Curated annotation (Swiss-Prot):
InterPro entries: AMP-bd_C, AMP-bd_C_sf, AMP-dep_synth/lig_dom, ANL_N_sf. Its main location: other. Keywords: Fatty acid metabolism, Ligase, Lipid metabolism, Peroxisome. A motif (Microbody targeting signal) lies at residues 576-578. GO terms for biological process: fatty acid metabolic process. Belongs to the ATP-dependent AMP-binding enzyme family. One of its GO terms (cellular component) is peroxisome. It is found in: Peroxisome. This is Probable acyl-activating enzyme 12, peroxisomal. May act as an acid--thiol ligase that activates carboxylic acids by forming acyl-CoAs. Gene3D superfamilies: 3.30.300.30, N-terminal domain of ligase-like (3.40.50.12780). It comes from Arabidopsis thaliana (Mouse-ear cress). Expressed at low levels in leaves. It is an enzyme of class 6 (ligase).
Length: 578
């Protein structure tokens, strides 16, 4: 059999951009994009992407050139996930919530050939260019503005415009053949910068092959059927929308784009467009719960929600499902090209009590098909931990959907791939049924008197306490045990008023600590509760625990006697944003 050679017919490089061509041919009458009054079919989206790719090629943008974009969830942002790699270039989607200094640092590192930016961000663009030119007076970074597609715009002769590029593009048959035939599936398709919750963000290089396999694994793991209606509550800049930018094309789905994630907008779009799927971080659950919920009982099925980014407490999942959403938990990393674990529902779970079902659903789940293996290993011995749901270790993985590495950072790449695995830095356990469950980030583990305390486990208990909207638990200093848990809590609106706020919070803190003592081993219970109006979050909605740790460092843990008695005293309460 060794004499059977690879050829053009049986050795085609894998790339998710082929999903676009297939969608235009297989679903010609299907709506691809909805944005306000704008509607596109799949053939129209295909044509627009081909024209944009042709224009980029005419600007001498090609293989391995970086194309940066700062834009919200709009048709342009979606189209660029195809058009940029079709031109042979590498898409660099940038978090729109970053400030000019952070974006300038990314551009300085990525060195893009061109920058696309949403028109309403023009002041931000000018500030970014000023920062870049202050270091390099010879800088010549072309900027293309993306206007609101639903509204007329005036484009000066000196200004470049996204829609003009599409109109000018001339995709000849020769160019079209080139666009969908990449030479090497290991070539980069996307450059994604990590969220930077721990330190300076790193540039993650994703390959065509990795994106293709991760996309297929995601739509299979989520059991996404043909022609879904997908609501873009998750930013497309966040790990390419967890690969569903390409996944919706693979399924011939409809992308409902929305700029602002608010409860009224979400519920309006669900009703108006009969949305079937959406992704979000758990903080969006609180937006849904605080908003005026929609009666979804008349629908033929629930809205399927894939959530990740941080472990959602079972109590929170239960509340959201009662609104008419069917929640599936996933776990992933930018370095792994999106989700790598899906909590696949098992039929035997249907016979369990609701609370137990929610506990199982809150786990991270089983590995995607695109990975060779996921394991939980002792960081010191590199041996697999027992599958007992108790013994903690680091979550590691390997497979063809893993990143190529960090751009211009060989040291970080080496550390990430040490011991032949992608090391996640997340601490978890494996249950007897093979499901992985995150217990914490390694840096968030609290070590009290030599005992490891999972902040996530403590948070899960606090979330079950009435009127708790959000919580985060971090370490605070303790004179005897070194560290002890400190809980930061956001209460539901209206839980306290200005007149008796102080007294109520004192009572709340006392009751909450006592509740934890009834449901957790005493060494795991918070010695301090700090009430906030809002938890600090980064642009992706992840809670910024380093900021909370900074506050906790200045607090004093009480001894065991005072924890039990909880005498009346002023309660720490921080207002506004951190």
């Amino acid at each position: 059999m060794d004499n059977l050679a690879l050829c053009e017919a049986n050795n085609v490089p894998l790339t998710p951009i082929t999903f676009l061509k297939r969608a235009s041919e297989c679903y010609p009458n299907r709506t691809s994009i909805i944005y306000g009054k704008t509607r596109f079919t799949w053939p129209q989206t295909y044509d627009r992407c081909c024209r944009l790719a042709a224009s980029l090629i005419s600007l001498n943008i090609g293989k391995n050139d970086v194309v940066s974009v700062v834009a919200p969830n709009t048709p342009a942002m979606y189209e660029m996930h195809f058009a940029v790699p079709m031109a042979g270039a590498v898409l660099n989607p940038i978090n729109t919530r970053l400030d000019a200094t952070s974006i300038a640092a990314i551009l300085r590192h990525a060195k893009p050939k061109i920058l696309f930016i949403y028109r309403s961000f023009e002041p931000l663009a000018r500030e970014i260019l000023q920062l870049l030119s202050s270091e390099d007076s010879n800088l010549n970074l072309p900027v293309i503005f993306i206007h609101e597609i639903d509204f007329p715009k005036r484009v000066s002769s000196e200004e470049s415009d996204y829609e003009c590029l599409i109109q000018r593009g001339e995709p000849t048959p020769l160019l079209l053949a080139r666009m969908f035939c990449i030479q090497d599936e290991h070539d980069p398709i996307s450059l994604n910068y990590t969220s930077g919750t721990t330190a300076d963000p790193k540039g993650v290089v994703i390959s065509h092959r990795g994106a293709y396999l991760s996309t297929l694994s995601a739509i299979i793991g989520w059991e996404m059927g043909t022609c879904p209606v997908y609501l873009w509550t998750l930013p497309m800049f966040h790990c390419n929308g967890w690969t569903f930018t390409w996944g919706t094309a693979a399924r011939g789905g409809t992308s409902v784009c929305m700029r602002h994630v608010t409860a009224p907008e979400i519920y309006k779009n669900i009703e108006m467009h009969n949305v079937t799927h959406m992704c979000c971080v758990p903080t969006v659950f609180n937006i849904l719960l605080k908003g005026n919920s929609l009666d979804l009982s008349h629908r033929s099925g629930p809205v399927h929600v894939l959530t990740g980014g941080s472990p959602p407490p079972a109590a929170l999942v239960k509340k959201v499902q009662r609104l008419g959403f069917q929640v599936m938990h996933a776990y992933g990393l930018t370095e792994a090209t999106g989700p790598v674990l899906f909590c696949e529902w098992q039929d035997e779970w249907n016979r369990l009590p609701e609370n137990q079902q929610m506990e199982l659903k809150a786990r991270q789940g089983l590995s995607i098909l695109g990975l060779t293996e996921v394991d939980v290993r002792n960081k010191e011995t590199q041996e697999s931990v027992p599958r007992d749901g108790k013994t903690m270790g680091e979550i590691v993985m390997k497979g063809s959907s893993i990143m190529k590495g960090y751009l211009k950072n060989p040291k970080a790449t080496y550390e990430a791939f040490k011991h032949g695995w992608l090391n996640s830095g997340d601490v978890g356990v494996i249950h007897p049924d093979g499901h992985v469950e995150i217990k914490d980030r390694s840096k968030d583990i609290i070590i009290s008197g030599g005992e490891n305390i999972s902040s996530v486990e403590v948070e899960n208990i606090i979330y079950k306490y009435p009127k708790v909207l959000e919580t985060a638990v971090v370490a605070m200093p303790h004179p005897t045990w070194g560290e002890t848990p400190c809980a930061f809590v956001v209460l539901e609106k209206g839980e306290t008023n200005n007149e008796d706020r102080e007294d109520k919070l004192v009572t709340k803190e006392r009751d909450l600590i006592e509740y934890c003592r009834e449901n957790l081993p005493h060494f795991m219970c918070p010695r301090k509760v700090v009430f906030l109006d809002e938890l600090p979050k980064n642009g992706n909605g992840k809670i910024l625990k380093p900021k909370l740790r900074d506050i906790a460092k200045g607090l004093v843990a009480e001894d065991e006697v005072n924890v039990r008695s909880k005498v009346q005293r002023p309660v720490e309460h921080f207002t506004s944003r951190l």
